[in-house]
């Protein structure tokens, strides 16, 4: 089958189109004809060998897919051929077919096309799990969302507003800031301005925010700690700024604050010890919550652009140059 192939560690744009063996159907799995696949900043790290998880080479990158079931193993009764599904997989999304354990496959909500299903898996799954399950964000709390113009950040803004929180969002372009206001952010800051603590404290009357949603890391993390109110929580979910910060715990003591990590990949088996089976109830709960957001209209998955597989380099350029407002999707 045709696929985008990573044979050795290299930049995403330097990968090559090629052929990969058609995966074998195994007990407990379904075969999916892939119609759309998501790529992200993390996809680039994976193919460069810089991610914490290193697939055996050669492999096709891509972990978020949507498509139609074309075959099911004899012991699978949750799905049948023709079902519209989505899944977060180990790798292999940028290919024509994938064979996936049925326990990590979910129906595509009614009314969404193939590309629109992609943000639900990582962007909305990460944000729902982090804000609802981990931070326990409550109505009336202030939440500061960094990187709010990207897929994960947009989802965090929508979910926080749905929960009744007050949102301060940061983004780097006029277009992104306008979209965030449209989606309900109470205050939108220019992320090109290095100092965000001053306006955050002004907006909150000197109190600070209850929750920080940080997908950037680096200096943003350190300044964010100083934006927390007493008893505040800082969610660290990624390091798109490139630097993994270290923590001086004295500030946690002074503010009675909590720093908490959230790795959505843990729920899908992306850890040294594969926990996907044990964590199925928690994963199902998050995905049910995400589907509920779509049904209620609280979530409007935003796809920035859709590219054919042949234009994979152009697709990733949108991410590398930070032009994407929402998700980038490739159709294999």
Place the predicted regions along the sequence by residue.
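Glycine-rich beta-strand-centered segment in the early N-terminal region that forms part
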Residues: 21-39, 50-92
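NAD(P)H dinucleotide-binding glycine-rich loop of Rossmann-like/cofactor-binding domains
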Residues: 33, 45, 56, 78, ...
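Short glycine-centered segments of the SAM/dcSAM-binding site in methyltransferase folds
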Residues: 84, 142, 166, 232-233, ...
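Mid-domain Rossmann-like dinucleotide-binding core that forms the NAD(H)/NADP(H) cofactor-binding site
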Residues: 118-120, 124-194
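NAD(P)H cofactor-binding loop motif with strongest signal on the N-terminal glycine-rich segment
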Residues: 147-148, 216, 239
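Short amphipathic alpha-helix with an adjacent loop that forms part of the alpha/beta core around
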Residues: 195-206
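C-terminal capping/lid region of NAD(P)-dependent oxidoreductase domains
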Residues: 206, 291-306, 313-332
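Glycine-rich phosphate-binding loop and adjacent beta-alpha segment
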Residues: 219-296, 324, 331-332
